């Protein structure tokens, strides 16, 4: 990993008036030029982290580092970060130009340079020609662009975004996701984005921190977190999931619903109780006799791109299926899936334990592969003789 631009070392936050611990020993490192997302429900602590980076809140314990320098005691205006708030925090009595130029005027930048830089950033956010437009006459999406332009005009090392898209309608929010991601990649600035919207996080991020109750419960790429949730909370919070109790018989073999299935996971104890996750889109509808499982369709909703089908197996387990194929309520269908569609979660495993287990398991597999290669090479030499 490159030298981190931002680092949290054992950071906690307690609100003394209520004695509420909203952050619990947070540790992470952020690289320069990436798009990070803090994802969690309301009250998970994600906005608290953002406010501590910005200097709007003090950490109770721990160190906050920016480029290797401790910044706990450095005031907000001296930190090379800029925040875009959910409310945008624009000045209603100023036009677009004056709002965007405001940070430069505080630094007493030359008038000609201000005009040049404002024109550049307004072009970046597709607001050319809006310089004299009143803030009050802008749409929600246009106000969002003004707030982003103001955030990047000083070319900060880090831009913090606190649920900036939540007030927009669905179509505009989706458009802004593309625009924000493209802008971040073009500028090469580190973005730290806060949201409770899982699809938003998956679509935009290089790296996601999933938060719950003041803790980071899992971090990783969007694909890693979606495909390999570490626990029940992550599996249900990130997308839809079918979760069932199971037993890991041995490496690559799991039992659930009274049957044994091939899997791709390993590194657990023989006959260890686990939770089995299968995503709704990974289930394929077949004839009952051709399916690995048989279920009875209970309800069906059309979601536009697919049907969302709820069905129950003979043990009473509920199954959600996403399919482009329409089912009939009351009919029995088969469900088929591949070994790689089965995700295994160890009970009560932390992210540190998960990473250590996977690392140890990979090392063992590599050693076994090396031993097999050595034996094969030895046989080849013997055959030559």
UniProtKB/Swiss-Prot annotation:
Binding site for ATP: 40-47
Main localization (coarse): membrane
Keyword Translocase: yes
GO molecular function: ABC-type polyamine transporter activity; ATP binding; ATP hydrolysis activity
Catalytic activity: ATP + H2O + polyamine-[polyamine-binding protein]Side 1 = ADP + phosphate + polyamineSide 2 + [polyamine-binding protein]Side 1
One Pfam family matching this protein: TOBE_2
Top-level EC class as recorded in UniProt: translocase
Assembly: The complex is composed of two ATP-binding proteins (PotA), two transmembrane proteins (PotB and PotC) and a solute-binding protein (PotD).
Topology with respect to the bilayer: Peripheral membrane protein
Family the entry assigns: Belongs to the ABC transporter superfamily. Spermidine/putrescine importer (TC 3.A.1.11.1) family.
Residue ranges occupied by any ABC transporter domain in the UniProt entry: 6-238
The protein's Enzyme Commission number: 7.6.2.11
Signal peptide: none
Keyword Cell membrane: yes
Function text: Part of the ABC transporter complex PotABCD involved in spermidine/putrescine import. Responsible for energy coupling to the transport system.
Localization in the cell: Cell membrane
Entry protein name: Spermidine/putrescine import ATP-binding protein PotA
GO cellular component labels: ATP-binding cassette (ABC) transporter complex
Species classification: Bacteria, Bacillati, Bacillota, Bacilli, Lactobacillales
Keywords for this protein: ATP-binding, Cell membrane, Membrane, Nucleotide-binding, Translocase, Transport
């Amino acid at each position: 990993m490159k030298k981190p631009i931002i680092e949290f070392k054992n950071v906690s936050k307690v609100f003394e008036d209520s004695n509420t611990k909203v952050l619990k020993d947070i540790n992470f490192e952020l690289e320069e030029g990436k798009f990070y997302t803090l994802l969690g429900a309301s009250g998970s602590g994600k906005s608290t982290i953002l406010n501590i980076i910005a200097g709007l809140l003090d950490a109770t314990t721990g160190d906050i580092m920016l480029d290797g320098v401790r910044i706990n005691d450095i005031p907000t205006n001296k930190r090379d970060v800029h925040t875009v708030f959910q409310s945008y925090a624009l000045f209603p009595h100023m036009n677009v130009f004056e709002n965007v130029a405001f940070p430069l005027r505080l630094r007493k930048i030359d008038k000609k340079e201000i005009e040049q830089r404002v024109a550049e950033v307004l072009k970046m956010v597709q607001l050319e020609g809006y310089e004299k437009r009143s803030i009050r006459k802008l749409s929600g999406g246009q106000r969002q662009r003004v707030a982003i332009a103001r955030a990047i005009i000083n070319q900060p090392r880090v831009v913090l975004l606190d649920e900036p898209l939540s007030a927009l309608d669905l179509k505009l929010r989706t458009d802004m996701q593309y625009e924000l991601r493209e802008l971040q990649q073009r500028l090469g600035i580190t973005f730290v984005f806060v949201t409770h919207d899982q699809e938003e996080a998956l679509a935009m991020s290089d790296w996601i921190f999933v938060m719950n109750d003041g803790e980071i419960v899992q971090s990783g790429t969007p694909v890693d977190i979606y495909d390999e949730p570490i626990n029940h909370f992550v599996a249900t919070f990130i997308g839809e999931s079918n979760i069932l109790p199971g037993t890991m018989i041995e490496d690559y073999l799991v039992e659930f619903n009274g049957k044994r299935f091939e899997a791709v996971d390993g590194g657990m104890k023989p006959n260890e109780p686990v939770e089995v996750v299968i995503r709704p889109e990974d289930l394929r509808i077949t004839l009952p006799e051709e399916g690995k499982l048989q279920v009875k369709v209970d309800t069906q909703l059309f979601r536009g791109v697919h049907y969302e089908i709820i069905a129950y197996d003979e043990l009473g387990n509920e199954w959600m299926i996403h399919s482009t194929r329409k089912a009939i309520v009351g009919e029995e269908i088969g469900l088929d899936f591949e070994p790689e569609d089965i995700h295994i979660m160890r009970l009560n495993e932390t992210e540190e334990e998960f990473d250590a287990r996977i690392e140890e398991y990979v090392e063992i597999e590599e050693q076994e592969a090396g031993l097999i290669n050595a034996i094969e090479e030895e046989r080849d030499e013997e055959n030559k003789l």
